[in-house]
């Protein structure tokens, strides 16, 4: 504590030289307006004198050179760690942080004016912005014991108000004797004088002299605790706290950003100083906490100052201790080229199989590299990977998403059937106290630089259009209540959906199974389809896995080791023959990997955060990896070449590059290798196969969008009926049918199969080697209509 005793090591003992005292007396009203006069023997004055001596030393010249000039507002960023060895300063900051910071500002004011040959009145008040202050405190621990203390909290900006002027000081004039009274408003709380202090005048009426008002910029923000923190508690509403920003701190953050706020904890009672009646007796003893911000640090400030970690897409001030860095180094050295398999099986080990699906989600967690994110002259290219898992109920899709949100350094999990459009993107809310409109961030904005997991994706068809911009342009534009803005939403989207009707129908396209537009589906880099196929061998091994998961005898033979004894099934039972290379390499062997132990969640989160923050792989041109990706893309274009257009576009090539960069990030490499490209091609092939295969097992790239064969058959039969009425005949040759299919742009790979299916259904009848009669034509007077499905 800063007491009345002499300072140890302080030059000059208790005395204060006349020059310092005169200088402090001149600037004192600027920093302590509530004090009527400068007291040289006061605690704050002696602290300021000590700080003048400290900052006058040559070691402090570098610190004072950092004074920032933002118009008429001056500020000095001070690293707390540089002052931590000075006990008397840390004790003063702990006992009365407001007084200590103001005294420090007054001392810096004197030194800056002396070093720049300026008069004390030539510059305005200097604000001390203390950062890097001790360990952050969780919002749940912020209670009454911290009132008037200096603390540091971290969270996501949930809401930002408009900037308004706050009155700090105002003169009032008595209506009776015309005497003027200066009035200082502590903490901005407006409190006019009660009665005139002049002898003999008892007037209670005063006129505010608005021209004498001393103002400063004021803004409120609300921050929410980080959902993926290790101290996060499930089953409760995330805690929030309001922070007051003043002067140079206003407009330093936007909704969705992760910020570290250092400030003083204060209390406020909404019913204080309010006239009688019910409001005076209601909740009179209840207060709520808020922060008076001293400094705000966020990724935008770091990126603007040239910090490469922020520019590379870090997860917002993830701290790495020496033990963390040592673990990452040893983990990479121990597993070598097997890191990907180790991380993949550490992710959601309770789900059996689905290695390639887990591989795709793992790559989405690491993400690619965003290009041109800072250069204003170039269009940014997203590096986040989007994936959707479609399949029958009960295959573990929701567990995969919850596991992804849990291990992500910044992950948000939402359910589609309880999510609104505004809750997913951004809402405009009205402040009850100021009647102003402000933005309130939704899930996509809160997950900025992270991952957003959306379950029950098929239940939110009305909100699909809101995701189109957020998934490709990585931002959310809003124009509501007279507010027009664009908020960052640089997030990976992981979605899980059940098909319409509860069971995936191979005869329908992915769009028809999900009721999803082709524009939204094309934005997903990976589309995985999980089918519940009856398989005696697979069912036996899945049941063994589930029983092993639930049977823990309490001995060293834990459930985790018991799971390893379950033999992994052959890929041909799930994925088909001929596509087993990557899946077989990723699969755990029951004998070789019997001692496998998954990586704990906190360590996996640290590894992912480090990779995303410090590893920025690139793909060189020319290189074997680039040539391999380009060749695969060109082969896809050739295979999907058709007259009605193709779903294989440049987006697939960009997806391949993003996946290859993510694969290199897993191994902490700065260069994409040929092996990375091969593994990514295997994953992309699996995704395309699932998306484009039909009910007969035939791969048709046009089936990723558009209509299924059933709807194409309906369209073709309708055209045949129209031709019967126009040409007054009901028999057509195959050549005429081919010409008709071309005219109506029928999107089928095999017209003969369509004709054969219509013949088998009885809608057309074969009359010769290549002649067919239309049975449902109105030309024959038939009243039959197309009613079959």
Swiss-Prot record:
Main location: nucleus
Single GO biological process annotation from the record: DNA replication
Sequence positions that bind ATP: 391-398
GO molecular function: ATP binding; ATP hydrolysis activity; helicase activity; single-stranded DNA binding; zinc ion binding
Species for this entry: Oryza sativa subsp. japonica (Rice)
Record function comment: Probable DNA helicase that may play a role in DNA repair during meiosis.
Catalytically driven reaction(s): ATP + H2O = ADP + phosphate + H(+)
Family in the record: Belongs to the MCM family.
Organism domain of life: Eukaryota
SMART domains attached to this UniProt entry: AAA, MCM
UniProt KW keywords: ATP-binding, DNA damage, DNA repair, DNA-binding, Helicase, Hydrolase, Meiosis, Metal-binding, Nucleotide-binding, Nucleus, Zinc, Zinc-finger
Entry EC number(s): 3.6.4.12
UniProt keyword annotation of rRNA processing present: no
Span of domain MCM: 339-546
Entry protein name: Probable DNA helicase MCM8
Phylogenetic placement of the source organism: Eukaryota, Viridiplantae, Streptophyta, Embryophyta, Tracheophyta
UniProt motif (Arginine finger) ranges: 522-525
Span of zinc fingers (C4-type): 174-201
SUPFAM superfamilies given in the database record: Nucleic acid-binding proteins (SSF50249), P-loop containing nucleoside triphosphate hydrolases (SSF52540)
Localization of this protein: Nucleus
GO cellular component: MCM complex; nucleus
Metal-binding is among the record's keywords: yes
């Amino acid at each position: 504590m800063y007491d009345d005793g002499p300072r140890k090591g302080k030059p000059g003992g208790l005395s204060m030289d006349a020059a310092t005292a005169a200088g402090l007396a001149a600037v004192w009203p600027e920093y302590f307006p509530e004090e009527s006069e400068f007291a040289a023997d006061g605690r704050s004055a002696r602290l300021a004198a000590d700080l003048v001596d400290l900052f006058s030393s040559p070691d402090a010249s570098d610190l004072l050179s950092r004074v920032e000039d933002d118009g008429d507002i001056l500020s000095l960023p001070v690293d707390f760690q540089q002052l931590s060895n000075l006990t008397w300063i840390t004790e003063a900051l702990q006992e009365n942080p407001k007084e200590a910071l103001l005294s420090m500002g007054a001392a810096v004011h004197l030194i800056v004016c002396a070093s720049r040959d300026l008069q004390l009145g030539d510059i305005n008040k200097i604000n001390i912005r203390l950062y890097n202050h001790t360990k952050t405190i969780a919002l749940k621990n912020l209670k009454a014991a911290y009132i008037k203390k200096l603390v540091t909290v971290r969270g996501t900006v949930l809401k930002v108000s408009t900037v308004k002027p706050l009155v700090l000081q105002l003169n009032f004039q008595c209506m009776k004797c015309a005497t003027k009274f200066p009035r200082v408003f502590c903490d901005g709380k407006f409190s006019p004088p009660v009665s005139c202090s002049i002898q003999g005048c008892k007037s209670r009426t005063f006129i505010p002299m608005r021209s004498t008002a001393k103002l400063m910029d004021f803004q409120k923000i609300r921050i929410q605790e980080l959902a993926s923190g290790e101290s996060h508690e499930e089953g409760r509403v995330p805690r929030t706290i309001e922070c007051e920003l003043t002067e140079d701190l206003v407009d330093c953050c936007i909704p969705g950003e992760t910020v570290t706020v250092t400030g003083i904890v204060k209390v406020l009672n909404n019913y204080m100083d309010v006239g009688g009646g019910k409001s005076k007796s209601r909740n009179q003893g209840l207060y709520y906490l808020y922060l008076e911000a001293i400094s705000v640090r966020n990724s935008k400030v770091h990126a603007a100052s040239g910090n490469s970690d922020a520019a590379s897409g870090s997860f917002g001030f993830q701290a790495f201790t020496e033990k963390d860095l040592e673990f990452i180094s040893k983990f990479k050295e121990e597993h070598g080229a097997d890191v990907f398999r180790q991380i993949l099986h550490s992710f959601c080990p309770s789900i059996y199989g689905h290695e390639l699906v887990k591989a795709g989600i793992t790559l989405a967690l690491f993400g690619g590299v965003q290009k041109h994110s800072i250069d204003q002259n170039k269009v940014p290219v997203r590096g986040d990977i989007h994936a959707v898992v479609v399949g029958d109920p009960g295959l573990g899709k929701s567990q995969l998403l919850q596991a992804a949100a849990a291990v992500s350094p910044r992950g948000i999990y939402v359910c589609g059937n309880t999510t609104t459009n505004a809750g997913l993107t951004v809402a405009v809310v009205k402040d009850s106290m100021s009647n102003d409109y402000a933005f309130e961030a939704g899930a996509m904005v809160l997950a900025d630089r992270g991952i957003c997991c959306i379950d029950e994706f098929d239940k939110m068809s009305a909100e699909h259009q809101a995701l189109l911009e957020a998934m490709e342009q990585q931002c959310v534009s809003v124009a509501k209540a007279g507010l027009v803005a664009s908020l960052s939403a640089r997030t990976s989207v992981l979605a899980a959906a059940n098909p319409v009707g509860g069971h995936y129908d191979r005869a329908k396209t992915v769009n028809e199974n999900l009721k999803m537009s082709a524009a939204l589906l094309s934005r997903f880099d990976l589309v995985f389809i999980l089918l519940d196929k009856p398989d005696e061998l697979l069912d036996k091994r899945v049941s063994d896995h589930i029983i092993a998961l639930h049977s823990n005898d309490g001995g060293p033979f834990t459930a985790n080791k018991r799971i390893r004894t379950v033999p992994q099934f052959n890929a041909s039972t799930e994925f088909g023959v001929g596509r087993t290379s990557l899946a077989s390499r990723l699969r755990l062997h029951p004998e070789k990997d019997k001692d496998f132990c998954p990586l704990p969640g906190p360590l996996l989160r640290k590894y992912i955060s480090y990779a995303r923050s410090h590893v920025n792989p690139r793909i060189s041109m020319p290189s074997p990896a680039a040539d391999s990706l380009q060749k695969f893309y060109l082969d896809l274009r050739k295979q999907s070449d058709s007259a009605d257009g193709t779903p294989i576009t440049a987006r697939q090539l960009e997806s391949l590059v993003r996946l290859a960069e993510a694969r290199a990030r897993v191994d902490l490499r700065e260069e994409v290798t040929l092996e990375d490209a091969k593994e990514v091609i295997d994953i992309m092939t699996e995704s395309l196969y699932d998306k484009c295969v039909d009910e007969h097992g035939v791969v048709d790239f046009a089936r990723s969008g558009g209509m299924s064969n059933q709807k194409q058959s309906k369209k073709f039969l309708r055209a045949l009926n129209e031709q019967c009425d126009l040409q007054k005949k009901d028999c057509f040759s195959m050549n005429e049918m081919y010409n008709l299919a071309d005219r109506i742009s029928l999107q089928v790979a095999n017209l003969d199969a369509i004709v054969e299916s219509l013949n088998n259904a009885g809608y057309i009848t074969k009359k010769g080697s290549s002649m067919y009669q239309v049975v449902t034509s109105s030309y024959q007077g038939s009243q039959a209509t197309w009613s079959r499905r």
